[in-house]
Amino acid sequence: ATEVKQSRLLTYLSDVARGDENLVKQMKYNGACEWMEDRLVVHNGGVMYGPYLTMPPMQYKLCVEVSYEGSEAAVLAVTKESGKVRLGEMQLKDGFNAISLYLEEKTENLEFVLSNATGEDIVVKKITFI
């Protein structure tokens, strides 16, 4: 049992060590989104979600860089259990956005969800979870 726990811990630590990795390429999306080079354009009506991470309990910082010129609030939600449990959210503005998030327990299938109902495009450049 100790070996399994150590193995899991090592897996978690390797995930945490890669925290500066841009997660945009791991995101899922509906038909109202498209790739523009290495950026995901979420058009009006578009939904971006994922990347379904498994993370140990600790403090994290979610950083999202977008290009967005709209005036309507664009909200990115942090959820688990297929969106049934909302752990946090942030209003996105043009440029760099960040929130701190504390996970009290091991969290599986952690996802970041952006449903665009702003009438404008939101270009997602970078997502990190460190």
Feature names for model-found ranges:
Residues 110-116:
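Short, aromatic- and glycine-rich surface loops/edge beta-strands on solvent-exposed regions
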Residues 3-59, 65-79, 98-100, 117-130:
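Glycan-recognition and processing domains
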Residues 83-109:
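Extracellular carbohydrate recognition and processing domains
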